Amino acid sequence: MGADSVINYTQGLREQVKDLTNDRGADVIYDPVGGDVFDESMRCIAPFGRLLVVGFASGRPAQAKTNHLLIKDAEVIGFTIGALGRLDPDWERRNFDVLMGWLAAGRITRTSPTGCRWRRRPRP
């Protein structure tokens, strides 16, 4: 579980993906932003890749162009962890227990949180 690379989408998303993947495209893109970022992500997905839509922080939900999906044999998957808990709380509990077991057994590890200083933005 994890990512090979993390990209700042505000700094040339497509160019960064091309550089990191030797022009192949990303196998998986996790998109909590939607809107223009989703549109650009669709152009960055590798053949048979998956684009995970987990939110629309931009305020504009994702709208998939099916021609991009067909050309690349790619998938767009919508996911929210909250819905799983509401639809099947027992499933969510079982999965949580499995993850905690893996953590206790050392099969997975948690990363140490990294911090950054938050500065209050001056009022206009």
Predicted regions mapped to residue ranges:
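Adenosine-nucleotide cofactor-binding segment
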Residues: 1-37, 91-94
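Helix-to-beta-strand junctions that scaffold the AdoMet/dcAdoMet cofactor pocket
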Residues: 45-46, 70
